[in-house]
Amino acid sequence: VIEARSEVGGTASSETFSGVTVNICNCDHLTFRTTGVSEDLDLAKHGLKYLDVDPTQLATSWSDRRIWPHFRDVDKTLDVIKHFFKDEVDGYRAYLRDAMPIAEMIIDAASQPPTRRSLISKVISRRGRGVTTMLRWSKLSSAQVLRKYFKSELLIGPALVTGPTVWGVSPHTPGTGLGALTYAMRHVSKVGRPIGGSGMVPISLRR
């Protein structure tokens, strides 16, 4: 593991700010749990253990009093959408049809060192499912992608907040389209929070 900063752990590491210790990016962990890094470094032996988080997200807005949960289970999430956004159910299903193959392919590819041979073999094994959509989305902005499926800002906003906005770029920036995978990724992988907080990642790395 190579770190450019003096503190290990990337955005999970802690800094002193206004007299308190905070994570640079206080977030639940999803992608990190799919890469195999924790297992390769045996971080559980050094204190990194997770609690699975479900619902994976609670969303609301400044102007709307509705608070709606997003679950890992697709059917439970569709039930929520039926309750809060009746005219968005078909759009969410269409989104998942396009997004899930991409998310599954990315997670699969991240599970081992990416070589040209391994990536090609994964695409072939999936019969190319998701490749065309992935290439098309990658040229668009995240906002453009999500607006192809959803009308309500209450559905679009939470996906953008945990996507490109976290990266520090506008969701209207061309080339951020794969940031629209937020919801799909939460169905494909387990969202978790380290026991002891996000800072347990750098602590376990130091140990």
Placement of each model-derived feature along the sequence:
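Short helix-capping/linker segments at secondary-structure and domain boundaries
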Residues: 42, 169-173, 186-191
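N-terminal glycine-rich phosphate/pyrophosphate-binding loop and immediately adjacent elements
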Residues: 1-107
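Active-site-adjacent bridging/hinge elements
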Residues: 2-5, 175-181
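Short, conserved clusters of charged catalytic residues that mark active-site
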Residues: 32, 141, 200
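A short glycine/serine-rich beta->alpha loop
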Residues: 17-20, 166-168, 189-192
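Helical element adjacent to the flavin cofactor pocket in flavoenzyme catalytic cores
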Residues: 137, 180-207
